[in-house]
Amino acid sequence: KQVIILPNGRKMALSISGGVSWYPENSTDLSTLKKYADFAMYQVKKAEKGHITEFDLELFTKNAKETEMRRLFHKMLNEELFTYYFQPIVSAADGSIYAYEALMRGNLPALTRPDQILQLAHEEECLHEIERLTMFLSAKSYATFLSTHQIRGDELLFVNSIASQYMNHDEAVAYVEQYSFLQDRIVIEITEEDSQDLTALLKKREMPG
């Protein structure tokens, strides 16, 4: 850092952050070199300002992959690209299926696992959307299986709920209106991955239906 004297006599600290990309090691294309240098500069600004650093291809590739995953995640949310598979829960007494657990999977090849989806939802502050979609889409799947006679209709439905999240009043009312037939068969399981939130847990209990 350097200190400069302004025309009014005041002192101001001045520092410079910069990024460097090399020709031809990083690229032979001028626009690509500028993009790489900009990326290096922004990495300095994110970490510790007042330094100059060289372009890191490995870091750039990792950043590009993370950006693409975030794009895919929001596409998945906006288009509701989820499937809820029903895992049967069998009675030890007579071997009959008395319940199903709805297991979330993403419908995009690069984003299928629940842990991936929940991690991105946490980073992008979209846990509420996952909670809402899980409640609605799992119930929709139950209704579809019932209408196509793939289930009897008296089975319970276990749904994984995020501990810190709950549907708002309007969402809860819409849920009950659409799936009133299912209200006495829903079993809410609180996920252990998320921190417990007493307010959210109370809101879940107070939801209509």
Task: Please state what every model-predicted region is.
Residues Q2, S21, Q87-I89, R105, ...:
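Output-coupling edge of small sensory domains
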Residues V3-L6, R10, S17-E25, T32-A47, ...:
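Cyclic nucleotide signaling catalytic output domains
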Residues M12-L14, Y98:
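PAS-family sensory domains
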Residues K65-H122, N160, E189:
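Active-site core of bacterial EAL-family cyclic-dinucleotide phosphodiesterase domains
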Residues S96-A99, L127-L201:
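Catalytic core of bacterial c-di-GMP phosphodiesterases, primarily the EAL and HD-GYP domains
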Residues K204-G209:
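Short beta-strand/loop segments at the ligand-binding rim of alpha/beta enzyme cores
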